[in-house]
């Protein structure tokens, strides 16, 4: 089987929601919602995936569109939307090639979606695309993660299991990661297994080398500055408190000038 050019496919996409569980109380949900309520609609959810934010906000009457580069994730989003009697505008595009029919008051890029841009030439291009898709005075809100700091181990691994509701099968996910300080890039290997009666009946491995780019707070702010954003602020995790120097998760917000 030829490996798709997008990261989320196959068992990884199928069991994405299962491993995330109930996300209704996640802090980022309330943070994004507060920004939308303050700065307005329409909204674009970049890297919308299976619709965690998109469908939630649509149910609240928010005018929001979604874009993702994975057809597998978008298909799952459509299935979930149909069950909720929702018809979202969904677009399959890569964010550095973003070309949508309308502009937005608020653009959200949840999770680590922006950090999946691995070619160093793509982040500034993508910031320009976001800028062009904002209405004058519109805002761009993105979280960032600093994946590694001096003294951290370079390698790590973990295993998680969940139960598939339909048949009681155990779904096991194992991940190995290695960080490269010289490039600020992380490699990952993810293995998904479906287990029934103590036997592995299906397995799929995803190798991404590299998989994710790490950003310091200074690098994230520079992206906004270089793209022409103004009123840039950096927040502690998913709060409106000022960022702390030691924060590994933080959100950046900036505005396209009027």
Q: Predicted regions: what is each one?
A:
Residues 211-258:
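C-terminal lobe and adjacent flexible extensions of AdoMet/dcAdoMet transferase-like proteins
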Residues 143-219:
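SAM-dependent methyltransferase
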Residues 52-97:
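Class I SAM-dependent methyltransferase SAM/SAH-binding core
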Residues 110-112, 143:
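Residues lining the SAM
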């Amino acid at each position: 089987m030829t490996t798709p050019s997008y990261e989320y496919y196959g068992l990884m996409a199928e069991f994405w929601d299962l491993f995330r569980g109930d996300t209704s109380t996640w802090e980022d949900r309330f943070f994004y919602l507060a920004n939308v309520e303050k700065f307005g609609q329409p909204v674009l959810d970049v890297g919308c995936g299976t619709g965690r934010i998109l469908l939630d906000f649509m149910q609240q009457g928010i005018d929001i569109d979604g874009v993702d580069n994975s057809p597998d994730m978008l298909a799952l989003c459509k299935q979930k939307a149909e069950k909720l009697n929702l018809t979202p505008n969904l677009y399959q595009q890569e964010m550095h090639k973003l070309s949508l029919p309308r502009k937005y008051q608020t653009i959200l890029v949840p999770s680590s979606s922006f950090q999946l841009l691995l070619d160093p030439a793509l982040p500034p291009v993508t910031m320009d695309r976001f800028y062009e898709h904002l209405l004058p005075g519109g805002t761009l809100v993105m979280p960032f993660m600093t994946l590694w700091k001096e003294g951290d181990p370079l390698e790590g691994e973990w295993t998680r299991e969940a139960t598939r509701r339909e048949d009681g099968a155990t779904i096991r996910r194992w991940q190995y990661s290695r960080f490269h300080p010289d490039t600020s890039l992380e490699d990952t290997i993810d293995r998904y297994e479906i287990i029934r009666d103590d036997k592995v009946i299906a397995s799929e491995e995803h190798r991404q080398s590299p998989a994710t780019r790490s950003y310091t707070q200074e690098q994230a702010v520079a992206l906004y500055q270089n793209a022409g954003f103004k009123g840039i602020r950096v927040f502690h995790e998913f709060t409106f408190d000022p960022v702390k120097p030691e924060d590994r998760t933080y959100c950046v917000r900036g505005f396209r000038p009027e």
